[in-house]
Amino acid sequence: MQQEKELVKQKAKELLLDLLSIYTPSKNETNATKFFEKISNEFNLKLEILPDSNSFILGEGEILLASHVDTVPGYIEPKIENEVIYGRGAVDAKGPLISMIIAAWLLNEKGIKVMVSGLADEESTSIGAKELTLKNFNFKHIIVGEPSNGTDIVVEYRGSIQLDIMCESTPEHSSSAKSNLIVDISKKIIEVYKQPENYDKPSIVPTIIRAGESYNVTPAKLYLHFDVRYAINNKRDDLINEIKDKFQECGLKIVDETQPVKVSINNPVVKSLTRALLKQNIKPRLVRKAGTSDMNILQKITTSIATYGPGNSMLEHTNQEKITLDEIYIGVKTYMLAIEELWQKS
C-alpha cells in the first residue's frame, strides 16, 4: 500500500509540474497538445482531440472523469517545496485533472474502462463541455473534477445568465445637457441590482459599463453587462423580465446561459464518492456552490453525476494556488474506489 502511494505521488509530481509549466488560459488549450500525446503513449490511453474546442479525451468507456485544462489568466512559475506544488491551475483544475488521469491509468490497467477529459474553456463559456454534449456521448456516470477540499461532494450549482444591454440617447454639450445617459442608466442599475446574499436568493450584478467618447459631450451610447445567478428554485423568466421592464428603452441580448443543476443524494455517483471517502476515514460533506461548473452542462448526457476533487477551493483564481501530493493521492484513491464500485454495479 505504501509503495503504491509513493508511486502515485511521484507520478503526480512529475505530471503536475509538467502541466503547470504549460500556460493554458481559456482559448489556448492547444498549448497542452504534446503533453496529452505523451500521456496517451505512456499510459496506453487512446487520445481524441475535439476539433471545435480543442478539448482532450483519453481512454474509452461509459464512465467519464471530466476536468478542465484551461485556467484563468496569469502565469505563475511552478515550483515544489516539501511536497507542496505551486502554480497557476494547481488547484483549479490541473491538480484534480492529474488525479483523474492517474486514476484512469490505474483503473484501465485493472481492466476497468474509464474515459478522462481535459475540457477546454471551463473558465469562460464551457465550449468544451458543450461540444462533448453534441458528440453523441452518453455516459452511465460522470465525476466532474473541481477542487472541493478533498472532502466535499458538490450536488448543486446555481445557473447563470449573461446579459448585454445597449442603450442610446441624444448627445449634448455637457455644460448645458438636460439629460445624461450615464446618470439615467445608473439609477436603473441601482434599482435592479440584487447583491449576492445567500444561495437561494438570485443575484443581479453589473460587471461592465462603457459609455462616452469626449470629455465635454454626454454619451450617445452605453454598454452594460449583467451577470445573473440563480438557484434551481428561482424562476429564470421572472429575472429576465424584471431587467427587461427596467430597461425598456434599451436593447437586451442573452450572450450566454447555463442552467442550474441539482442531483439527488441517492445519485449513484454521490453514493459511491461518499463510500469512497468513508473507506479512507474521511468524513464527506454534501455541498452546493454559488457559481457554475461543467457539471451544469454535462448533466445533459448522464443521469448520474456529481463533482469532487482535491485542492482547497478558497485558493481558486488566486496567486497562491497550491496543492499537496497527499491531496492528489487522496483524490486518486477516491476516484478509483468510487469507480470500482460503480463498475461492479454496472
Curated annotation (Swiss-Prot):
InterPro entries: ArgE/DapE_CS, Bact_exopeptidase_dim_dom, LysK, Peptidase_M20, Peptidase_M20_dimer, Peptidase_M20A. Zn(2+) 1 binds at residues 68, 92, 146. Binds 2 Zn(2+) or Co(2+) ions per subunit. Pfam families: M20_dimer, Peptidase_M20. Zn(2+) 2 binds at residues 92, 123, 317. It is found in: Cytoplasm. It catalyses: [amino-group carrier protein]-C-terminal-gamma-(L-lysyl)-L-glutamate + H2O = [amino-group carrier protein]-C-terminal-L-glutamate + L-lysine; [amino-group carrier protein]-C-terminal-gamma-(L-ornithyl)-L-glutamate + H2O = [amino-group carrier protein]-C-terminal-L-glutamate + L-ornithine. It is an enzyme of class 3 (hydrolase). One of its GO terms (molecular function) is zinc ion binding. Its EC number is 3.5.1.130, 3.5.1.132. Pathway: Amino-acid biosynthesis; L-lysine biosynthesis via AAA pathway; L-lysine from L-alpha-aminoadipate (Thermus route): step 5/5; Amino-acid biosynthesis; L-arginine biosynthesis. The active site is at 70, 122 (proton acceptor). Catalyzes the release of L-lysine from [LysW]-gamma-L-lysine and the release of L-ornithine from [LysW]-L-ornithine. This is [LysW]-lysine/[LysW]-ornithine hydrolase. The lineage of its organism: Archaea, Thermoproteota, Thermoprotei, Sulfolobales, Sulfolobaceae. The gene is lysK.
